[in-house]
Amino acid sequence: LKAIFVINKTSPKVSPTGGDLEGAGGALMKEYLTSVIKRFEYYKTLAEQTFGQVNDEGLFWQYNEESNSIGMIVQHLAGNMLSRWTDFLTSDGEKDWRDRDAEFERAITTRTELLTQWNKGWDCMFNALNSIGDDDWKKDIYIRNERHSVVDAINRQLAHYPYHIGQIVFIGKMVAGADWHSLSIPKGKSGSFNSEKFKNPGDNKANV
């Protein structure tokens, strides 16, 4: 039997199977946001586990003059987060008070300062993400006067932050040397790791 739907301006949008598209869309966006937050938390943890394996001097070590230290990358991430996520839904993500160039000059000099800036940036981002309401997904977001959907603006940062966190981990491995402990699957252990994971299919958390 063919179903016939008559939709007027006041009717909810309906799928061919009889579902409410608007309701389904809201549920989908909540699932998306939950997934995004989970991924951000994962990469945040990777960086923090790296901080824990690097001594204070190593946090500010540079391979050469053109390279960034872990401290500089943290400055950049914190600066970006504060700029992008402050008034996320109502103002351009590139704030006039941000000094991006200064983020790549050594300003942070201690581990305590580093962690303070780090947490300040992440707190700003998570607070912004958790404040997104159902109607906000329809809004336009601007970054340097370039229009984005809310999803695209989030995805932009979801690609940007892991890029720099990968740099943090790489520098951490160079600094720690033989004392480095793998943050994922140790070399030569993929087979045993996978065997353990597949003992209880469907019950394991994602791991890369």
Segments from the language model and where they lie:
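Ser/Thr/Pro/Gly-rich low-complexity, intrinsically disordered segments
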Residues: P12-K13, T17
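Glycine-biased, low-complexity coil/linker segments
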Residues: G18-E22
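Intrinsically disordered, low-complexity segments enriched in serine/threonine/proline/glycine
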Residues: G23-A24, L28
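Extreme N-terminal tail/first-helix region
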Residues: M29-R39
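Short, contiguous alpha-helical
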Residues: I37-E41, E48, D56-A102, I143-V208
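Hydrophobic alpha-helical core bundles mediating ligand binding, dimerization, or RNAP-core interactions
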Residues: F40, K44, F51, W118, ...
